[in-house]
Amino acid sequence: MIIRSPESEVKIMVDRDPIKTSFEEWARPGHFSRTIAKGPNTTTWIWNLHADAHDFDSHTSDLEEISRKVFSAHFGQLSIIFLWLSGMYFHGARFSNYEAWLSDPTHIAPSAQVVWPIVGQEILNGDVGGGFRGIQITSGFFQIWRASGITSELQLYCTAIGALVFAALMLFAGWFHYHKAAPKLAWFQDVESMLNHHLAGLLGLGSLSWAGHQVHVSLPINQFLDAGVDPKEIPLPHEFILNRDLLAQLYPSFAEGSTPFFTLNWSKYAEFLTFRGGLDPVTGGLWLTDIAHHHLAIAIIFLIAGHMYRTNWGIGHGLKEILEAHKGPFTGEGHKGLYEILTTSWHAQLALNLAMLGSLTIVVAHHMYSMPPYPYLAIDYGTQLSLFTHHMWIGGFLIVGAAAHAAIFMVRDYDPTTRYNDLLDRVLRHRDAIISHLNWACIFLGFHSFGLYIHNDTMSALGRPQDMFSDTAIQLQPIFAQWIQNTHALAPGATAPGATTSTSLTWGGGDLVAVGGKVALLPIPLGTADFLVHHIHAFTIHVTVLILLKGVLFARSSRLIPDKANLGFRFPCDGPGRGGTCQVSAWDHVFLGLFWMYNAISVVIFHFSWKMQSDVWGSISNQGVVTHITGGNFAQSSITINGWLRDFLWAQASQVIQSYGSSLSAYGLFFLGAHFVWAFSLMFLFSGRGYWQELIESIVWAHNKLKVAPATQPRALSIVQGRAVGVTHYLLGGIATTWAFFLARIIAVG
């Protein structure tokens, strides 16, 4: 830590009125580009307009102006998010059965959408219990609302209006910080100040205020709800906040106020800041008192972290020094120069953030079912499946986005002349070794993981079950995973002496938790079937990484095209007379990476869906006998490819295929329509540009013949545009098909 004398004055960090507000540009499509602003000669114009409208790098090379545009656009994004949230809360207030669900969450399903009776589509309003007819929703909003202490639809209404106000505020902020008071480049590059504010403000005070809300509002209200008190009888949130006696009736230590805090007698607060572990047997969710404790602890950590970096007071860490000191005996110059990269290339910064946020999103997916945070979430199987699937897809897209922006950084922002022997340079110099080893790992994983399945299919086909890899023949037990499970199951009393239960029931050892005759969670057994599919996961993830990493490491140059950096981020081929150089741009690697990301995530969500239906989800009788949805068939059926096709895809598609004439029929239509969208993508992916240009020219001839030819000359999509349209429909069709398949199935049987 370096202590310096404080600077004399605080610098002015904004420019006043830098850009006049005017709507004239709005009437000039493509005003950001000299070429596009001329207007359309051919139909390619509209595609270029869409491709470049948000590519601020292509509008100007002034980093300050680019930064301001991005900053302003972020406020627009936040405005849309608030608008969306407002819509969710408004539907909860206006069209939902939230109050009915609150009074009986085990027998009533959440619904917040009622279809109007036009052309007979009111058939979609299924009976969700309690006499309410509507579409069952699986977003988890009801469970979050209950956990945060919302007891009436009026409160949802008020929150919806509040979110609209914030949406308007964000729109105003976006305009204000671009047109009225635009930050200077130095403000965007002041990373210490940014870290302090984000850590202490967003994460620290954000967590602290949430912890405060939970203690003063959520906990008491949920206490009453769990005890079966009618929501209308429960005091309103502000009464708990203003009247300490109300809280003291539930938590006696509240009567002492903040005295225990300042006298360090913190154990007095153990009534509402607990460390129990496991699930609340009433709601099947994490103990809300554990969650409040967690957010308080997180808040303190981040409030401390938000005071670590040196700003106006000359005390604390400087990021540049930290990075430049970061070198080992084998890493050359180490992280020298990384500070300059991350403060001048927003693509590099974004790539890191996307990689971390994507990984974090996938971690969230896995914790939502293993440690269900909200009341009654664990027994709402449709919501559990939806939340897992949603967070897996989002995480996958963010990670591909990380590779995309890393490659854009390499092409547009990386300056090889100023970098020598730092870590990035060293990685680039031995990229051949990295990629060829990774390629070998992919080949090994692919042949061996798939080979185990093929062996099982062959033995099964030949009637030799004793020679298959299975829990009842040749066992391949995941011993390391089982060891980790066991370690966690034994942790309470050993490595975590204060906890009464392990972090998650899935680890094993503990009993199951059932709510309203449905299993919330129980120890998840792992066996040969999981061992096999986990190696498919390893394979698909490694191939995705191979494609994306190759795209980044070879974005500027390769043996095939040494001057690739001059061709840009996306280009079809290295010009005429250079055969075999198509589809090598960094963009094409992102394109291919998306398909493998889709493969990887599909296998994960299929595994999750079947495993949970087979080994976790189900009903429990009065005698304590658990009946799983698919009766534990995962261990024996999923060890062959045939089993996946027959007992998962085909057997579980029966609900969506047979949904016509029922309230689930919309899923049947979506299943069909999304298959169609997916098939439509193949038309773009499997044919060449010349084919379409030829077709278009004969169609134009016909139009000329009839004297109805348009002024704008029709053109086939460029190669890159065609692939972009193709991959978009492939992913959209595939994801929507999976969504319809999953939801029709789980709403019918769950």
Curated annotation (Swiss-Prot):
<comment type="subunit">
    <text>The PsaA/B heterodimer binds the P700 chlorophyll special pair and subsequent electron acceptors. PSI consists of a core antenna complex that captures photons, and an electron transfer chain that converts photonic excitation into a charge separation. The eukaryotic PSI reaction center is composed of at least 11 subunits.</text>
</comment>
<feature type="transmembrane region" description="Helical; Name=X">
    <location>
        <begin position="664"/>
        <end position="686"/>
    </location>
</feature>
<protein>
    <recommendedName>
        <fullName>Photosystem I P700 chlorophyll a apoprotein A1</fullName>
        <ecNumber>1.97.1.12</ecNumber>
    </recommendedName>
</protein>
<feature type="binding site">
    <location>
        <position position="691"/>
    </location>
    <ligand>
        <name>chlorophyll a</name>
    </ligand>
</feature>
<feature type="transmembrane region" description="Helical; Name=III">
    <location>
        <begin position="195"/>
        <end position="219"/>
    </location>
</feature>
<feature type="transmembrane region" description="Helical; Name=II">
    <location>
        <begin position="156"/>
        <end position="179"/>
    </location>
</feature>
<feature type="binding site">
    <location>
        <position position="573"/>
    </location>
    <ligand>
        <name>[4Fe-4S] cluster</name>
    </ligand>
</feature>
<dbReference type="GO" id="GO:0009055">
    <property type="term" value="F:electron transfer activity"/>
</dbReference>
<keyword id="KW-0813">Transport</keyword>
<feature type="binding site">
    <location>
        <position position="692"/>
    </location>
    <ligand>
        <name>phylloquinone</name>
    </ligand>
</feature>
<keyword id="KW-0793">Thylakoid</keyword>
<dbReference type="GO" id="GO:0016491">
    <property type="term" value="F:oxidoreductase activity"/>
</dbReference>
<feature type="transmembrane region" description="Helical; Name=VII">
    <location>
        <begin position="433"/>
        <end position="455"/>
    </location>
</feature>
<feature type="transmembrane region" description="Helical; Name=I">
    <location>
        <begin position="70"/>
        <end position="93"/>
    </location>
</feature>
<dbReference type="Pfam" id="PF00223">
    <property type="entry name" value="PsaA_PsaB"/>
</dbReference>
<feature type="binding site" description="axial binding residue">
    <location>
        <position position="683"/>
    </location>
    <ligand>
        <name>chlorophyll a</name>
    </ligand>
</feature>
<feature type="transmembrane region" description="Helical; Name=IV">
    <location>
        <begin position="291"/>
        <end position="309"/>
    </location>
</feature>
<keyword id="KW-1133">Transmembrane helix</keyword>
<feature type="transmembrane region" description="Helical; Name=VI">
    <location>
        <begin position="385"/>
        <end position="411"/>
    </location>
</feature>
<dbReference type="InterPro" id="IPR006243">
    <property type="entry name" value="PSI_PsaA"/>
</dbReference>
<dbReference type="GO" id="GO:0000287">
    <property type="term" value="F:magnesium ion binding"/>
</dbReference>
<keyword id="KW-0479">Metal-binding</keyword>
<keyword id="KW-0150">Chloroplast</keyword>
<comment type="function">
    <text>PsaA and PsaB bind P700, the primary electron donor of photosystem I (PSI), as well as the electron acceptors A0, A1 and FX. PSI is a plastocyanin-ferredoxin oxidoreductase, converting photonic excitation into a charge separation, which transfers an electron from the donor P700 chlorophyll pair to the spectroscopically characterized acceptors A0, A1, FX, FA and FB in turn. Oxidized P700 is reduced on the lumenal side of the thylakoid membrane by plastocyanin.</text>
</comment>
<dbReference type="GO" id="GO:0016168">
    <property type="term" value="F:chlorophyll binding"/>
</dbReference>
<keyword id="KW-0560">Oxidoreductase</keyword>
<dbReference type="GO" id="GO:0051539">
    <property type="term" value="F:4 iron, 4 sulfur cluster binding"/>
</dbReference>
<dbReference type="GO" id="GO:0015979">
    <property type="term" value="P:photosynthesis"/>
</dbReference>
<keyword id="KW-0460">Magnesium</keyword>
<keyword id="KW-0148">Chlorophyll</keyword>
<keyword id="KW-0812">Transmembrane</keyword>
<keyword id="KW-0249">Electron transport</keyword>
<feature type="transmembrane region" description="Helical; Name=V">
    <location>
        <begin position="346"/>
        <end position="369"/>
    </location>
</feature>
<feature type="transmembrane region" description="Helical; Name=XI">
    <location>
        <begin position="724"/>
        <end position="744"/>
    </location>
</feature>
<dbReference type="InterPro" id="IPR020586">
    <property type="entry name" value="PSI_PsaA/B_CS"/>
</dbReference>
<keyword id="KW-0472">Membrane</keyword>
<keyword id="KW-0934">Plastid</keyword>
<comment type="similarity">
    <text>Belongs to the PsaA/PsaB family.</text>
</comment>
<keyword id="KW-0603">Photosystem I</keyword>
<keyword id="KW-0004">4Fe-4S</keyword>
<keyword id="KW-0602">Photosynthesis</keyword>
<feature type="transmembrane region" description="Helical; Name=VIII">
    <location>
        <begin position="531"/>
        <end position="549"/>
    </location>
</feature>
